[in-house]
């Protein structure tokens, strides 16, 4: 019985901590003059707490595993809600497809150039050049 109570406490604590970060993010978003969603601010707050180890990762790990395990079910209502606007999506299908293609190509180009920049061949300090080695 004690083991069951401990397990329930871990799940409850994890979900409460995640929701507290979400509610804090919503409160901060309501106070800010810029339009950043509260869920994004809450996620950044949770990330900051975890990365500075103010909140140990083991406290939220059970809740995160639970949410990730059933993430597919969380997207079903969103998909059904999108189908409510099927006629509008069909009317604007061309611009939607073009914007998806352009944004995908832009991401590919930026990632390609960034990858080339960070993985370029660099000179090793103190190693003689090939031209100097031949002399």
Swiss-Prot record:
Keywords: Cell inner membrane, Cell membrane, Membrane, Transmembrane, Transmembrane helix. Pfam families: LrgA. Disulfide bonds: none annotated. GO terms for cellular component: plasma membrane. It is a multi-pass membrane protein. It is found in: Cell inner membrane. The chain crosses the membrane at residues 4-24, 30-50, 63-83, 93-113. The keyword Disulfide bond does not apply. The keyword Transmembrane helix applies. Belongs to the UPF0299 family. NCBIfam families: PRK01821.1. PANTHER family: HOLIN-LIKE PROTEIN CIDA-RELATED, UPF0299 MEMBRANE PROTEIN YOHJ. This is UPF0299 membrane protein Spro_1570. It comes from Serratia proteamaculans (strain 568).
């Amino acid at each position: 019985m004690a083991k069951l109570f401990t397990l329930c406490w871990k799940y409850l604590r994890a979900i409460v901590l995640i929701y507290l970060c979400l509610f804090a993010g919503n409160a901060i978003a309501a106070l800010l003059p810029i339009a950043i969603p509260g869920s994004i601010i809450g996620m950044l707050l949770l990330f900051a707490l975890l990365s500075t180890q103010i909140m140990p990762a083991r406290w939220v790990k059970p809740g995160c595993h639970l949410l990730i395990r059933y993430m597919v079910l969380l997207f079903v209502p969103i998909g059904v809600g999108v189908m409510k606007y099927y006629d509008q999506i069909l009317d604007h299908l061309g611009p939607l497809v073009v914007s998806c293609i352009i944004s995908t190509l832009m991401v590919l180009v930026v990632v390609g150039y960034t990858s080339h920049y960070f993985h370029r061949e660099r000179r090793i300090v103190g190693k003689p050049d090939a031209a100097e080695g031949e002399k």
